[in-house]
């Protein structure tokens, strides 16, 4: 299977919460996870942030006053997907712990999830869309060697 081209910028906020995850997210792994979720070529920036920046962005752009695990800002879907994915390190860490996953497993899942959003996938439009997105995410993650992220 030929993978699509990816121009990747990987950023870590100057925040202890974000930089603590640098070792978990080597550039080659992040690129591999994202490329497996791409149906088109893409230019993607991944930014790992702390709780304060994550909450500010979620409040400003989604009008929800809390830090969330991943925010996707998609600017263009075709012919090249252009997007920013912002992941909040302390939220990802807490969720991984609560779900008995490694940080790597949870980051891989959220990066695949965000990449699908960048290409127009949406799980908030209908139950059917949510189910289709979950099935596709699971297939991609299993192809990458990860377990089903939705298994109980």
UniProtKB/Swiss-Prot annotation:
It is found in: Cytoplasm. Its main location: cytoplasm. Keywords: Cytoplasm, Endonuclease, Hydrolase, Metal-binding, Nuclease, Ribosome biogenesis, rRNA processing, Zinc. The keyword Transcription regulation does not apply. One of its GO terms (molecular function) is metalloendopeptidase activity. InterPro entries: MetalPrtase_cat_dom_sf_prd, YbeY, YbeY_CS. Its EC number is 3.1.-.-. Its cofactor is Zn(2+). Zn(2+) binds at residues 113, 117, 123. Belongs to the endoribonuclease YbeY family. This is Endoribonuclease YbeY. It comes from Acidovorax ebreus (strain TPSY). The gene is ybeY.
């Amino acid at each position: 299977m030929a993978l699509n081209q990816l121009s990747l910028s990987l950023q870590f906020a100057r925040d202890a919460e974000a930089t603590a995850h640098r070792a978990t997210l080597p550039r080659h792994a992040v690129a591999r996870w994202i490329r497996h979720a791409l149906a088109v070529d893409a230019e993607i920036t991944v930014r790992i942030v702390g709780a304060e920046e994550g909450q500010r962005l979620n409040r400003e752009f989604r009008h929800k006053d809390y830090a969330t695990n991943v925010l996707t800002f998609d600017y263009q879907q075709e012919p090249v997907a252009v997007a920013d994915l912002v992941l909040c390190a302390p939220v990802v860490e807490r969720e991984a712990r609560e779900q008995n996953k490694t940080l790597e497993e949870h980051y891989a899942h959220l990066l695949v999830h965000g990449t699908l959003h960048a290409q127009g996938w949406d799980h908030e439009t209908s139950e059917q869309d949510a189910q289709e997105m979950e099935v596709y995410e699971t297939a991609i993650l299993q192809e990458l060697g990860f377990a089903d992220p939705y298994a109980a």
